[in-house]
Amino acid sequence: MPRTHARGTARDRLLDAAEELFVERGIAATGVDAVLGRAEVSPATLYAHFPGKDHLVAGYLERRHERWRATWDAALERCGDDPDARVLAIFDALDDFPTATSTRGCAFLAAAVEVTEPEHPAYRWLAADTHLLVERLRQLAAESGAADPDALAAEILGLYDAALASRTRRTVAGDGGPAPLPCRALAASAVVRHRA
């Protein structure tokens, strides 16, 4: 494996390596030794930053959550004051997100399959991701004039999840894969249909 982490702090190299490996292999299938090798750091360096693998997983999801939030914030900023565009900005953010073509799809949904105990240090980031999606979509739906913001938010979230699944299936299948679902267009129709 070529060296990909020549720069940055040891903590950043650990998080970069963990992200690459968790996306490639999954969390449970990735051992600490693989992360250490990819990051080119010692076990002592890992434990100086993270008490163990569970906390490394939490650090990975925390950083991923902050990157996703920043990407979505930027997409919202580009929409200006257009309330309909702001509801749909989640799809723009998905297009802009650096790992939109991952074969594992959403890092949080993939991690939720492996991190199921609420006491796990990473669980709070799974909850934070869901909270961000639900609450922000509800707020944006209300701002768009939806008669039932909860219903519109739920529909947009379902279409967002479908967009993630569609991208994953297409990435796995390559060029011969199914056409991507028109989730953004379906969401735009939902915004109009839910208007008060």
Model-derived features: positions:
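Hydrophobic alpha-helical connector segments
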Residues: 59, 73-103, 153-156
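Short, structured helix-loop boundary elements
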Residues: 11-12, 32, 54, 58, ...
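Amphipathic alpha-helical segments used for helix-helix packing
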Residues: 86, 99-121
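Generic hydrophobic, amphipathic alpha-helix propensity
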Residues: 10-18, 35, 60-64, 68, ...
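Hydrophobic/aromatic-rich alpha-helical bundle segments in the mid-to-C-terminal region
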Residues: 121-128, 142-196
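Amphipathic alpha-helical packing segments from all-alpha helical-bundle domains
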Residues: 66-69, 73, 85-89, 118-143, ...
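Helix-turn-helix
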Residues: 13, 17-55
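N-terminal intrinsically disordered/low-complexity leader segments
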Residues: 1-9, 16, 195-196
